[in-house]
Amino acid sequence: MKEDVGRLLIQFKNENGEGLGTPFDVPVDITPDKLQLVCNALLQEEDPVPLAFFVQDLEIVTSLDKTLEKQSVETEKVIDIIYQPQAVFKVRAVTRCTSSLEGHTEAVISVAFSPTGKYLASGSGDTTVRFWDLSTETPHFTSKGHTHWVLSIAWSPDGKKLASGCKNSQIFIWDPSTGKQIGKPLTGHSKWITWLCWEPLHLNPESRYLASASKDCTIRIWDTVMGQCQKILTSHTQSVTAVKWGGDGLLYSSSQDRTIKAWRAQDGVLCRTLQGHAHWVNTMALSTDYVLRTGAFNPADASVNPQDMSGSLEVLKEKALKRYNEVRGQGPERLVSGSDDFTLFLWAPAEEKKPLQRMTGHQALINEVLFSPDTRIIASASFDKSIKLWDGKTGKFLTSLRGHVSAVYQIAWSADSRLLVSGSSDSTLKVWDSKTKKLLIDLPGHADEVYSVDWSPDGQRVASGGKDKCLRIWRK
């Protein structure tokens, strides 16, 4: 007869450290599947969700004893096992290019799916914005009006409007269902537009207000219904590189003056200046970006043919608020910033101006940084050819994803936070698995540098664009 396997005392805890039940003993070689059964029984949820289990930040992948072997944990004491709910749906990796869409006559600078994945828009150096029909994967509308490169595009969280900003400082609003311009151009900035961001749906379901950042050192808040500038935020002394509209009523701006500023959106009062970077701040992300982008749309409810969200403004607002609160959790929104000084900083800007963590390791400037939709992982893309993953709560370094042979320009997460796609100046896209931290699929196809990449919120498609003027759509 086989000898009894050793047993250990464990205590389940959630991500905030709150205990679930009392300590109890389990076989030392217990697997994640068995832990899942025990934990679900304790949680008593009507619809159990998949869980991941961790001992001191290390995930239990095969069995508890294998995980403990890699760590110095006192096994005589009660071992805390942290359980983390995972996405209930699974996004499958894209593996092939289903369409190569021609039409732009200059480089494609930006591509973006609407919040439900119904529409795809692109902005180009040829001064046009194009809308693409995703059911047929063909060009839909070419929207003309800009007289210079379109540098930035942004979907309103209700999916009914797209804003675009160009190199000669104008902002246009477009209707994706007709490709026609809505209202007059928004004019007032004196230099080019670097970034656009709409007010979150749960704060205003009309998607009325838009924030813009410019090389002229200012941020402007626009009433897109009246076609007027409401506020001009001045305090930065150099180009503003990005602006984010947080879910708790703060606006955040990053600048080449090395600072990040937090403003009260309501009245434009400057609340905080975050300092620490030694050079230009190029990019930033909020832990709640994904839920703010998708508003009332839950990727788990996606249908085969994506549709706009239906329902009254009140219903949509409630849905968006519920989703926002679930993602935001108990702490405040976190912000991560990336700089020309090769570093990233993690902040809780609503609460304090000291950074939570300085994140070092990149060997060249940082192009883009993004939180995973579940806020647990931060991914950063750099000119050093690598993508690095960091813990979304602490900023602790997790791993480097290597495979690109040239600068990585842009990255995008899948809605379930399990996959990441990257676009590079080496002309390829690559799909990475955030759990195994490995390259899943290499996607060659572009003839030149890939400037922009996006993953549709319903998980079905990836779109990419770049120097070869072609827009490519990738599917599973």
From Swiss-Prot:
Alphabetized Pfam families for the sequence: NLE, WD40
Protein name: Notchless protein homolog 1
InterPro entries, per database record: G-protein_beta_WD-40_rep, Gprotein_B, NLE, Quinoprotein_ADH-like_sf, WD40/YVTN_repeat-like_dom_sf, WD40_repeat_CS, WD40_rpt
Highest taxon in the source lineage: Eukaryota
Name of the gene this protein is made from: nle1
Cell compartment(s), UniProt: Nucleus, Nucleolus
Region of interest (Ubiquitin-like (UBL) domain), residue spans: 5-87
Keywords: Notch signaling pathway, Nucleus, Repeat, WD repeat
